[in-house]
């Protein structure tokens, strides 16, 4: 397959991944519970470009917009030694799987250290790992309490993390909701009623006593 065909094929896969990302992740926040602790996670439109691994001159906002609207062109992406075709192909496949990971059994990894940076958390299904950090503005001030996906690793990252925990609960809600309204995953040995009060206070009444 030639380079042009590679780009055309990847662009089609990016469009599919963007559609899944838009339908299942953007505009929502997710609450992951593990060991009685929790973190809140956002999957932002602005992070989509980086997660694909492709090289492009488009801004993060334009890249996602074009992909979601199925307007992205093969001429707008390229591959480099830092953005190889084979890795991009695997990463784009994983983006589509993040939606499933956000509602299924998985592990929470703490303190993931890679060759280039450190991530506070990551969640994995043993095949890939979205790596999470808090978001900061240009002045170094923290932007909100939620974690965002900064990187998508094509590995489980267990060996790169300090500690691994089993995720026991995953909840979601629209960004504008005051409390979490949907239970996406519940470990077979866990209950909602058994959660610490701090977490239960974050849940809509319809989710309590499950």
Residue map of PLM features:
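Compact beta-sheet-dominated globular domain cores
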Residues: 125, 129-190
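An acidic, glycine-rich, mixed-charge low-complexity segment common to nucleic-acid enzymes
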Residues: 1-117, 122, 172-210
